[in-house]
Amino acid sequence: MGQIASSANDGKNNAILESFSKEQIMDLLSSRCLTLLRNVEITSITNKLNVTSLREKNVVTPTDLALLLQLSNDMDRDNSSVNESFNRALKILYESTRVIGSLPFLSNYTKTDTSGGLTIQELLISSLVHSARYKKIFNSQYDYLKLIFCSLALPRLAVETNSEESSVDFLSDKPKVVEQVRYPIREEDSPDIRSKKVKWDTFNIINNYDDIDISSLKVNAYDLVQIITLFLIISSIPKMKRDLMHQKLVGYIERWKEFEVYGLYILKYININLNATNLQTETITFEEFQTTFNRCLPNFFQNGFSILFKEGLLSTVVAKAGSNNSSKDIPNNPEPQKQEEEATKKKKFKLPKFEESKLVNAASLSYISNVVSGLGSSIEISNQNLIKLYAGTEAGFSIRSLESKIFKWQAPTLFVVSGKRLKNKTIDTNMRYQQFKTEYPQYFRSSESNKHDWQNDNDKITYAILINQPWKNSNKKNFGDENTIILSLSPRLDFYKSIHSTVLNGESIYFNTLGLGIGFGNTQPVNKNGVKKYFPGDVSLTIEANLEFAVFRHIVASSANTSTYFERSHQSQVRSSDFEDRFMITDLEVWGIGSTKDLEEQRKQWEWEQKQAEARQSVNLRSLGEERAFLEMVGLVGNHNSSGGSI
């Protein structure tokens, strides 16, 4: 390490430069990461790793990492015995941690023995990155998503090159690197002091990702689905006691396939032609990866990794003596919990507890909530603020039944409709559909194919609509606002946000009780002189009055006769395509979404209605005694074998 004299051209403030060896930089960054840890965290981590110092050169095994990140609580259990796909995700996570831990020399991973282990130093650097503390020392413009992609792609590159010499001139190949420091580094400075003097935010090796040609890197599609699935599971578990969270985790891992299908739907936003049979052979480029996750799920990886490392390695929760499963927080304040329990006891009326349904379960809910959050909606969706208002399979597929169930809810709702794509035989022979077809204007000519290559006869089609305003009868005028979002949930992810218009004002929804059903993105339909007619928008979802058929329409070129309430798809293979999803409805559900205030107001409203119903019943029972004698006289109640009476 040596100081180099700087000139006036070195920078505006006559920057001080130092030359560093590769080993010196790695040691300095490791020391800087240690300074970002609190003393209680250092103590906790050393205990978990069973070491005396975090500067030791011990190796952390995949099993160790699973334990440290709370993905396992059994050191002797083989993860592959839990679930093969889960085991694959753990291996991906382990290698990703090794790559990020090699900062700032990311290319080191491809030059070392890929069978090597994760060092404590690499684990700490990776944990500081995933807990977002890197922002305290790196450039504010540092691209976390790019780093994640490198960490997922470099292991594949290392295997492909099979330790062959690389022709790429990495910065890390140079024996000495000259970088800027805040103050001159002195011989007597401790490692921590030296690490703080370095201007990490100007390090070329860091800001240029070790000069790796990221455009040439690729991630295996199957591997990406597995890591997405893992994070969908992790994000589905609410904050609770450690042992309860782990019970949930184990249960959801056993349901891996349920979550995995939504991981595939997310990836189909990148490439609509991906499917379960070609995942192993398909790859994803950085441009595809970046575009999709910045557009739909910008914080998905940051949130997933953050939960793992903050709740795992960096957590200061310690186990109770004599127990491997139960734990307590330090410090622990029982007062809020006591107050909550007392408040619960006082409530006579309880809101329905969340129970999974055919359309909304742990897997689909994690998928929906992550996408809604990623699209920037202020409406938070979780199993802790959802109440099922209507399910067609329970209450019957009737517009009146639907109206009676959802119109009293005065907060946002999630409307989910699902069904089977209509096949040509059904389209040609089903009389009820033929009637709907005469009312819904045809866009495609009869001679044109009504499906694209990515639309299959056996598709299960599911759409969800996030609605911010309360429902109401709208036979003449639409309602809604610009917070409404249409989501395509299956067989692929897509989204259609409300456009901003001072004319339309986001009033894109109608609930028609005059035999014209429900529409999103349509102009008001007409029922005149017994003739019904729909006016679908360019991007719209139309549900006919019997809740039997639905059509999602996506037309690229606007027409003077149609309205446009929603943005067209941004998916690269769909945005320029005209298409329709016509399906026969098999399930329809509406869920109320409430804040704490909304839920409390709704509880009071339902409690009042319950009291009114009980009061009416009480009045009826009391009056029945006085009127019974008269009713028996005229033969309406009592002894029906008698001839009755007359007055």
UniProtKB/Swiss-Prot annotation:
It is found in: Cytoplasm. Its main location: cytoplasm. The gene is RTC5. The lineage of its organism: Eukaryota, Fungi, Dikarya, Ascomycota, Saccharomycotina. InterPro entries: TLDc_dom. GO terms for cellular component: cytoplasm. Residues 358-594 form the TLDc domain. Belongs to the RTC5 family. Residues 325-346 are annotated as: Disordered. This is Restriction of telomere capping protein 5. Keywords: Cytoplasm. May be involved in a process influencing telomere capping. Disulfide bonds: none annotated. It comes from the Eukaryota. It holds the Pfam family TLD. It comes from Scheffersomyces stipitis (strain ATCC 58785 / CBS 6054 / NBRC 10063 / NRRL Y-11545).
